[in-house]
């Protein structure tokens, strides 16, 4: 799991692979060097990006405003910054 996480000055950057239009929102293990996340929303007009941020914020117990999309706006492969948390906190909550 360490491959998909990196510590920065602001928090932790998480690499994810998003599978939209799934039957439910869930973590689905690792895919390569990314955490795979299945989401119910379609990849239309940023709906999957929004749900991805909300889902991770809920899992990590942080405000939605502290989860920011860094890259991958139009891609299934995304990098998200979770502000104000440590690598160990994210690792413990997502495992």
Curated annotation (Swiss-Prot):
GO cellular component: cytoplasm
InterPro entries given in the database record: DUF167, YggU-like_sf
Sequence similarity: Belongs to the UPF0235 family.
Record's protein name: UPF0235 protein Pcar_0617
Species of provenance: Syntrophotalea carbinolica (strain DSM 2380 / NBRC 103641 / GraBd1) (Pelobacter carbinolicus)
């Amino acid at each position: 799991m360490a491959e998909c996480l990196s510590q920065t000055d602001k928090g932790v950057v998480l690499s994810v692979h998003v599978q939209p239009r799934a039957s439910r929102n869930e973590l689905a293990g690792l895919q390569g060097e990314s955490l795979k996340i299945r989401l119910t929303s379609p990849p239309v007009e940023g709906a999957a990006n929004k749900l991805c941020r909300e889902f991770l914020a809920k899992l990590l117990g942080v405000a939605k405003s502290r989860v920011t999309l860094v890259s991958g706006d139009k891609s299934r492969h995304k990098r998200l910054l979770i502000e104000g948390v440590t690598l160990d906190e994210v690792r413990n909550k997502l495992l």
